[in-house]
Regions:
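Extracellular/lumenal ectodomain signal focusing on beta-strand-rich modules
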Residues: 15, 29, 94-96
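Sequence-specific dsDNA recognition surfaces
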Residues: 1-19, 32-33
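Short edge beta-strand segments in beta-sheet-rich domains
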Residues: 43-46, 90-92
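Low-complexity, Lys/Gly-biased intrinsically disordered segments
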Residues: 1-9, 26-27, 80, 88
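Short, ligand-facing micro-motifs at secondary-structure edges
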Residues: 18-21, 25-44, 60-64, 73-78
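Amphipathic alpha-helical coiled-coil/heptad-repeat segments
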Residues: 56-57, 61-65, 72-74, 78-81, ...
Length: 160
């Protein structure tokens, strides 16, 4: 609930946060939150790290660095508890990150940022379409919404 979220002292997700799952079956899985996707407001629990960069690197670079198979394997190898798979904060802070020249990171950002912005924008639109479909389809099937008199001849050049 909104009240629960507001009472949380830690773990609030910010735009472009990179999340790293630290235990369980999904250890090493990465996510990025942007522009309210997948949720407008969100917070994490104790099973996830929020990773935020400093001025040496960008969130986009960090996400793609972590998403490499070799780095994912290094993360999984940090597993400090065989009974319950998991990684700790010290292990994550000790992960190597190759930082190219700042100019190259800036170039990467200039290329990746508009692509990621569009990707997340389309993902939000897909969610909205899915929700709209979930609301409308049962009403259409049951006849609650009558489409007999709709004047739809074509949609985007496709004859209906």
């Amino acid at each position: 609930s909104q009240e629960f979220y507001e009472n949380m002292l830690r773990g609030h997700i910010k735009n472009k946060d990179v999340l790293l799952y630290k235990d369980g079956a999904q250890i090493g899985r990465k996510s990025m939150f942007r522009e309210g996707f997948p949720h407008e407001i969100c917070c994490i629990n104790e099973h996830v790290f929020i990773l935020r960069t400093n001025e040496l690197c960008t969130q986009n670079y960090l996400y793609f660095w972590l998403d490499q198979p070799e780095i994912t394997q290094k993360i999984r190898n940090l597993n400090a508890n065989a009974a319950q798979p998991g990684i700790n904060q010290a292990g994550v802070k000790g992960l190597p990150i190759l930082l190219p020249l700042k100019s190259l990171i800036d170039d990467f950002e200039n290329i990746s940022e508009p692509l990621l912005a569009e990707l997340f924008n389309l993902a939000k639109k897909n969610n909205l379409l899915r929700k709209t479909s979930d609301l409308l389809l049962p009403k259409l099937i049951s006849g609650d919404i009558d489409v007999e008199k709709l004047d739809i001849k074509s949609i985007n050049g496709v004859t209906v």
